[in-house]
Amino acid sequence: MLRPAGLWRLCRLSWAARVPAENLGRRDVTSGVSPRGSTSPRTLNIFDRDLKRKQKNWAAQQPEPTKFDYLKEEVGSRIADRVYDIPRNFPLALDLGCGRGYIAQYLNKETIGKFFQADIAENALKNSLETEIPTVSVLADEEFLPFRENTFDLVVSSLSLHWVNDLPRALEQIHYILKPDGVFIGAMFGGDTLYELRCSLQLAETEREGGFSPHISPFTAVNDLGHLLGRAGFNTLTVDTDEIQVNYPGMFELMEDLQGMGESNCSWNRKALLHRDTMLAAAAVYREMYRNEDGSVPATYQIYYMIGWKYHESQARPAERGSATVSFGELGKINNLMPQGNKSQ
């Protein structure tokens, strides 16, 4: 017999020659995709990148890909908002892991002079969404970027970096290709993403099969992001989190949409399949534990947003320790010397 409350704790614990960008014209395509299966010697090889390429290619060539674009379009618009928050223009920008171009559609040519859109999936690039910005499509792996140092004024990435095997190296490469005083703005799924689905599958599989395998890929913890960005060389960091909750008729509809997004699990240690009765049990657990009043079930997508700047001498820096000319002990005296009307009420 399933005991959801008793098992809740179980659920919760669980580089390609460098190409100068300015030599590429509109609609040109270059490739920086790594050899299949290649990874950095120090990489934790968690994800099957060839499988992820196939998943994204399959999703991009479906008859109605826009049916599954809702989440990536929403996060893409929020990345665009953060770009607009910076009062400057960006002559050359890169969207890393662009998919079908979910960020570019929300930006304009007054803000972005030229946009490079890079993705591991060629079908996503071929079926990209319309934008008024001059664009260049680049077939490239996020782990092996084919660009020279100090190339871009802006790099953005939305819901792509959670699939790389070596996130520290990917961030280091992003920093490398940014110009001094360039900025990186990214978004990736957080650790609580799809916790409802994860828990339901674990509970059902434990009950029916005597144990469970990971069916949802692992995510980076928010506490690690600031450290990783700093280690990659970024400064003036901002990291914040948000949650988007989407309601579905049931668990199977959620899983269908994840497949349509190209977000199916690609971990090497994934289980090939689940028995039919285990899937039905998981759907029942999902509905029992998380059902809304209208009968739908929620799915939570936790999003980490990050902003980091490449150092330039013009950037504001904190004053050196001990450079203050007034001590805290003298603040009272200064207050007494101020005109009465200037004192705070």
Swiss-Prot record:
Gene Ontology molecular-function annotations? monooxygenase activity; S-adenosylmethionine-dependent methyltransferase activity
Among the entry's GO cellular component annotations, what is one?
mitochondrion
Primary site of residence: mitochondrion
Record InterPro entries: Malonyl-ACP_OMT, Methyltransf_11, SAM-dependent_MTases_sf
Keyword annotations for this protein?
Membrane, Methyltransferase, Mitochondrion, Mitochondrion inner membrane, Oxidoreductase, Transferase, Transit peptide
Localization (cell): Mitochondrion inner membrane
Q: What is its EC number?
A: 1.-.-.-, 2.1.1.-
For this protein, the record's Pfam families field holds: Methyltransf_11 (PF08241)
A Gene Ontology annotation in the biological process aspect, one of them, is:
methylation
Q: Transit peptide span?
A: 1-36
Subunit structure, per the record?
Answer: Interacts with NDUFAF8, leading to stabilize NDUFAF5. Interacts with NDUFS7. Interacts with PYURF (via TRM112 domain); the interaction is direct and stabilizes NDUFAF5 protein.
Main function: Arginine hydroxylase that mediates hydroxylation of 'Arg-111' of NDUFS7 and is involved in the assembly of mitochondrial NADH:ubiquinone oxidoreductase complex (complex I, MT-ND1) at early stages. May also have methyltransferase activity.
Similarity remark: Belongs to the methyltransferase superfamily.
What's the protein here called?
Arginine-hydroxylase NDUFAF5, mitochondrial
> What gene name is listed for this protein?
NDUFAF5
